[in-house]
Each structure stands twice: as structure tokens, then as C-alpha cells.
Amino acid sequence: MNSRVRTLYKIAAQPDGPAQARQIIAEELSSWLPAGVVNDIKLIVSELVTNGIVHGSAERDTPVLLDLVVNGKIHCRVLDHGPGFATHTRRQSAGGGWGLRVVEQLSDRWGMQHSPQRTVVWFERQPCELRE
């Protein structure tokens, strides 16, 4: 797999933002990784960008940032301008709330940092299909 130090993208805080993020992931990773891994990463990124748009971008002109690093493993961060929330207090409902569960299931590691002005959710994924 080729190495890349870092690529930073601005994703419009609009309804098509998650699709834009999935397209970026497909363009960046499809030639390097098996389709199943790329699809997992597209799903994770789509969930995080959706959360960033819905919960973090009160003003639609403020983009969500997608920070993609490929260096032996995939490390990705999604940054928005929302205050975040405590993951242990988040409850799933029929209408939503399953995004971070998807992130947890499909990534090798993930985490979140937040302040009153910004939330960063990150994940790591090894570039192989065989994982425990």
C-alpha cells in the first residue's frame, strides 16, 4: 500500500456532505484496498460526517473537515464545530443514534475529543479484511 502523510478535505455541511465524503474515500483508497475494507471505511466516514453535519454545524456555511492519513494503517478524523457529547450518555432510538455503534464495530480503534467549540471523532483501521 502506498503511504500518504495527510490529506485534508472540507466537506460541505449540506445534505450531500456524506455522499461527498464517501466519494473521497472511494477515490483515495479503492486502488489500494480490498472493496470490503473500502466499503467499511466509507460507512464509518459517512456516519461521522452525518453526525458532524447534524450535531455540529449550526451554520451551514461552516464545513466539516475530513482528515485522512494512510501510513501502514488508515487513520481518519472528522472535525466539526459542535460541542460533542459524552458517549456513555448517548442512547439509541428508532430514529437514530446508531452511528457510533457502527464506528465501534467496523474500526480497530476509535475515540472522541471535544470542547465547547469543536468535536473531533477519529478511527483507525488496518488495511486488511482478516480481523478478529
What is each model feature region?
Residues 1-8, 53-132:
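Conserved beta-strand-loop-beta-strand hairpin that lines the nucleotide-binding pocket
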Residues 8-19:
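STAS-typified acidic loop motif
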Residues 18-25, 100:
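Heptad-repeat coiled-coil signal-transmission/dimerization helices
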Residues 22-46:
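Conserved short strand/loop->alpha-helix "switch" segment adjacent to the catalytic nucleotide/phosphoryl-transfer site
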Residues 30, 50-54:
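Short amphipathic alpha-helical interface segments enriched in basic and hydrophobic/aromatic residues
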Residues 45-46, 50, 102:
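Short alpha-helix carrying the canonical HExxH Zn2+-binding catalytic motif
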